[in-house]
Amino acid sequence: MKYDVEYSKTAMNTIKKMDSSTSKLIRTWIEKNLIDTENPRVKGKALTGDLKGLWRYRVGDYRILADIQDDKIVILILDIGHRSKIYL
């Protein structure tokens, strides 16, 4: 089954605030790698500690934090940010 991608309000606001080249890079990566994928875990890495249960995807120096909801067949993008600030 193919997964759909949904964005949280936080993720949408972050994308809108980014410069256009970074925003385009991230949106393109999501379109190519997550939309309609059959296994969203292949490109990501499971997080541990306080963020256990979430997944992260690397796009250059940026990270996409997501919740993979198998029961709904949805990848919920929770937040997007620079690798130095996203986990704070």
Question: Where are the regions a protein language model picked out?
Answer:
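A short, surface-exposed loop/turn module that caps and links secondary-structure elements
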Residues: 32-56
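Enriched for short, Lys/Arg-rich terminal
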Residues: 2-5, 9, 13-17, 24, ...
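Secondary-structure boundary motif
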Residues: 17-20, 36
